[in-house]
Amino acid sequence: MSQEKQVFSIDLAGRQLTVETGQLAKQANGAVLVRYGDTAVLSTATASKEAKNVDFFPLTVNYEERLYAVGKIPGGFIKREGRPSEKAILASRLIDRPIRPLFADGFRNEVQVVSIVMSVDQDCSSEMAAMLGSSLALSISDIPFEGPIAGATVGRINGEFVINPTVEQQEQSDIHLVVAGTKDAINMVEAGADQVPEETMLEAIMFGHDEIKRLIAFQEEIVQAVGKEKSEVKLYEVDADLNQAVREMAEEDMHSAIQVHEKHAREDAINEVKKRVIEHYEAQEADADTLGQVNEILYKIVKEEVRRLITVEKIRPDGRKGDEIRPLASEVGILSRTHGSGLFTRGQTQALSICTLGALGDVQILDGLGVEESKRFMHHYNFPSFSVGETRPMRGPGRREIGHGAIGERALEPVIPSEKDFPYTVRLVSEVLESNGSTSQASICGSTLAMMDAGVPLKAPVAGIAMGLVKTGEHYTILSDIQGMEDHLGDMDFKVAGTAQGVTALQMDIKIDGLSREILEEALQQAKVGRVHILNHMLSVIPEPRTELSAYAPKIITMTINPDKIRDVIGPSGKQINKIIEETGVKIDIEQDGTVFISSINQEMNDKAKKIIEDIVREVQVGEIYEAKVKRVEKFGAFVELFSGKDGLVHISELALERVGKVEDVVKIGDVITVKVIEIDKQGRVNLSRKVLLKEEQEKEAVKEENKQEQQ
C-alpha cells in the first residue's frame, strides 16, 4: 500500500464525499479520513498478530464523539469527554452489526475498529461517514475482512424516497431508515416510522440498497488502488478424529434433549449430555485445548440439529408451528403508587413496564453533537441476571440494554401525543423479569399498557414481535415470536413494532448472504399477522387509555402571558419565580413564546401559583377600579398595592372630597380602600383616586334622592 496521501471522491445525495488515505494514523492496519460535506471522521482498523485463546470472535467497534467537532467545550468540572453518550453507543452498534458477519468462522484474532468524529456538518451524517470509513479501513488493511459494506439513510417526503436527508428534510419525513449491507445483500436494518405500511418499508429498504451498491463500487476502486494484500491467518478448526468421536458419543442423546419443550428442562437435558462427554475426556486427562474443542463440537451438534428440525421437519424446539405465538398474559395497574404500570408475559418472557409523568422541566438535556437539545419521551430497559436464572454483578446499563431501550423508544415515539395536547414529560422503565427471547418487543407491549394505564392519550397502541429465519440450502422457515435458542442459532433476528395501521420501528440483523426480497416480504407480512394478534390481546385487557391521570401524577395547567412579561415573572436573578415556587411548591416552566406550564400534585397550589403570575403580568388600565391595601404612608399621599407586584399612589388631594390635612387622618397602613386608576404616566407610574369614586357615589345618591322625591 502506498504511504503517500491519496484522495478519492464521489457525490452522495448532492453533497461531496471524499476519502483520504496515506496521511493519518499510518501505524494502524488500515486508516481513512472520510469527509462528507463539512463532516470529518477518522476511521482506523487494527488487529492482533496472534489469535486469542477464546471461543468467540473478539471484535470491538467504537464510535467516538469529540465535542470540539461542533465547537463545544464539555460541561462539568473536568472539561473533557467522559463515558460515551447513548447516541455514540447506538452508532457503535449500528456499525458493528453489518461488519461482524463478514469475518470467517474460526477467526479469533482481536480486531478493533475506531471511528473518531472530528467535525460535524448536521446535514451530512457522521454515522454514515463512520460506517463507510470503518468498512474501508478494514478493506484496505491486511485484516481478512470479507467486505466491503456500506450504509445509507433513507427518508420519505411527500411519498418520495430521499437518500441521506438533511435536518430539515428529516423533520418532514415519515420514515427514518438506516440500511446496510454488501453489494449482494442487506444484512442490517434500523428504522423508525410513523405508522407506515409494510410494503412501503420494503420499498425503502430496496431503495437504500441501490445506493449501497454504488458506494461499495466506490470502495472497491479505492481498495484496488491502495489496498494491502490480506494476511494469511490460521482459522480455528476442531480435530477431525475428535469431531467424529464426540459425535458418535453424543449425537443421538443430544437430538433427544433438543426436543424437550420447556426451556429449563431442555437446557438441563442438553447440559447433562455435555457433562457426560466432558467427564469422559477429563477422565482421559485431556488438555484444555482438547476440552475446548469438545465444547465446540457439542455446540455445533446442537446448532445443526435445531436448524435441521426447523427447516426440514418444521419442528420448533418448544413444539410450536412456524407462525404460532406463545401464550399471552397481561395486566395493568399492579403498582398502586406509580402513575401507570403494565405487565406483559409471552411464554417465558416477561416485562414489567412503569410509566412516570413529569413536568416539562423534567426533560432529558442532551449535550452531544446533534441539533437536538432535549427530549420529553424516554424509554429505559433493564435486564437483571435473575431474568435468566443466573448470578452476575449488577452494573449500569451496557450496550445491549441501551440498544433495546432505544428500539422501544423509537417504536413508541410516533404515537406519543404532542406537547400541546399533553404537556408532560414521559419516562418509561421496562424491567425484564423473565427472558426467553424477544424481551425488547415484550418491553414495547408492556410500555404501551403502562401508558394507557397512566392515561397518556396515545394516538394508537403499539405492539412488537421478533421474527426469525432458518435457511439451509433451498429449505427455509420464517419463525414468529422467536425464543432465545432460535435467535442464537438462527440466521435472522427481525424485530417489527407497530400499530394496526403500520410499522413504527424495524430492527433487522442477518447472519447469512443473499436474503431475497421475497423472504423479506413474507417475514413482514407474517409479522403483521402476529402483531395484530398481540394488539387484540392487549386491547382486551385495557381497550383505551384511562380518561383520568393517577392521583399521584402531577397536575399541569397551562397559561399564556405576554413574552415581554417573562422577565417580570422570573424577576432579578430568578428572585420572583423562586418566591412563587417556595410559596406554592409547584414547578414552573416558561417557553419563549410566553406559554407557562405550572405543575404539582396539588391542584389548589397550581391555581394559587397561576393567580400570582396573573397578578404579576396583569396590565393596569385607566378607569379600572381596585380594592387596594395601604402599604406605605407619606406626607404627600398613600402607596397602595393593587395586586401582587403592582403598586400605585393615591395623592393626598385624591383621598377625600374635603381637604385633607394629614394622610393618616383618612388611611393608615393595612387599610383596604377602593380606588380608581386616573392616570399612568410615561414612566409607568400609576396614579389613583379615592375622591373620584366618593364623588361618583355622592352623585348617584343625589340622583336617587331626586327620583324618590319625584315619585312622591
Swiss-Prot record:
<dbReference type="GO" id="GO:0003723">
    <property type="term" value="F:RNA binding"/>
</dbReference>
<dbReference type="Pfam" id="PF00575">
    <property type="entry name" value="S1"/>
</dbReference>
<comment type="similarity">
    <text>Belongs to the polyribonucleotide nucleotidyltransferase family.</text>
</comment>
<dbReference type="GO" id="GO:0006396">
    <property type="term" value="P:RNA processing"/>
</dbReference>
<dbReference type="InterPro" id="IPR001247">
    <property type="entry name" value="ExoRNase_PH_dom1"/>
</dbReference>
<dbReference type="InterPro" id="IPR036612">
    <property type="entry name" value="KH_dom_type_1_sf"/>
</dbReference>
<dbReference type="InterPro" id="IPR020568">
    <property type="entry name" value="Ribosomal_Su5_D2-typ_SF"/>
</dbReference>
<dbReference type="Pfam" id="PF03726">
    <property type="entry name" value="PNPase"/>
</dbReference>
<keyword id="KW-0479">Metal-binding</keyword>
<dbReference type="InterPro" id="IPR015848">
    <property type="entry name" value="PNPase_PH_RNA-bd_bac/org-type"/>
</dbReference>
<feature type="binding site">
    <location>
        <position position="487"/>
    </location>
    <ligand>
        <name>Mg(2+)</name>
    </ligand>
</feature>
<dbReference type="GO" id="GO:0006401">
    <property type="term" value="P:RNA catabolic process"/>
</dbReference>
<keyword id="KW-0694">RNA-binding</keyword>
<keyword id="KW-0963">Cytoplasm</keyword>
<dbReference type="GO" id="GO:0004654">
    <property type="term" value="F:polyribonucleotide nucleotidyltransferase activity"/>
</dbReference>
<feature type="binding site">
    <location>
        <position position="493"/>
    </location>
    <ligand>
        <name>Mg(2+)</name>
    </ligand>
</feature>
<dbReference type="GO" id="GO:0000287">
    <property type="term" value="F:magnesium ion binding"/>
</dbReference>
<comment type="function">
    <text>Involved in mRNA degradation. Catalyzes the phosphorolysis of single-stranded polyribonucleotides processively in the 3'- to 5'-direction.</text>
</comment>
<dbReference type="Pfam" id="PF03725">
    <property type="entry name" value="RNase_PH_C"/>
</dbReference>
<dbReference type="Pfam" id="PF00013">
    <property type="entry name" value="KH_1"/>
</dbReference>
<dbReference type="Pfam" id="PF01138">
    <property type="entry name" value="RNase_PH"/>
</dbReference>
<dbReference type="GO" id="GO:0005829">
    <property type="term" value="C:cytosol"/>
</dbReference>
<dbReference type="GO" id="GO:0006402">
    <property type="term" value="P:mRNA catabolic process"/>
</dbReference>
<dbReference type="InterPro" id="IPR015847">
    <property type="entry name" value="ExoRNase_PH_dom2"/>
</dbReference>
<dbReference type="InterPro" id="IPR004088">
    <property type="entry name" value="KH_dom_type_1"/>
</dbReference>
<protein>
    <recommendedName>
        <fullName>Polyribonucleotide nucleotidyltransferase</fullName>
        <ecNumber>2.7.7.8</ecNumber>
    </recommendedName>
</protein>
<dbReference type="InterPro" id="IPR036345">
    <property type="entry name" value="ExoRNase_PH_dom2_sf"/>
</dbReference>
<keyword id="KW-0460">Magnesium</keyword>
<dbReference type="InterPro" id="IPR027408">
    <property type="entry name" value="PNPase/RNase_PH_dom_sf"/>
</dbReference>
<dbReference type="GO" id="GO:0000175">
    <property type="term" value="F:3'-5'-RNA exonuclease activity"/>
</dbReference>
<dbReference type="InterPro" id="IPR004087">
    <property type="entry name" value="KH_dom"/>
</dbReference>
<dbReference type="InterPro" id="IPR003029">
    <property type="entry name" value="S1_domain"/>
</dbReference>
<dbReference type="InterPro" id="IPR012162">
    <property type="entry name" value="PNPase"/>
</dbReference>
<dbReference type="InterPro" id="IPR012340">
    <property type="entry name" value="NA-bd_OB-fold"/>
</dbReference>
<keyword id="KW-0808">Transferase</keyword>
<feature type="domain" description="KH">
    <location>
        <begin position="554"/>
        <end position="613"/>
    </location>
</feature>
<feature type="domain" description="S1 motif">
    <location>
        <begin position="623"/>
        <end position="691"/>
    </location>
</feature>
<keyword id="KW-0548">Nucleotidyltransferase</keyword>
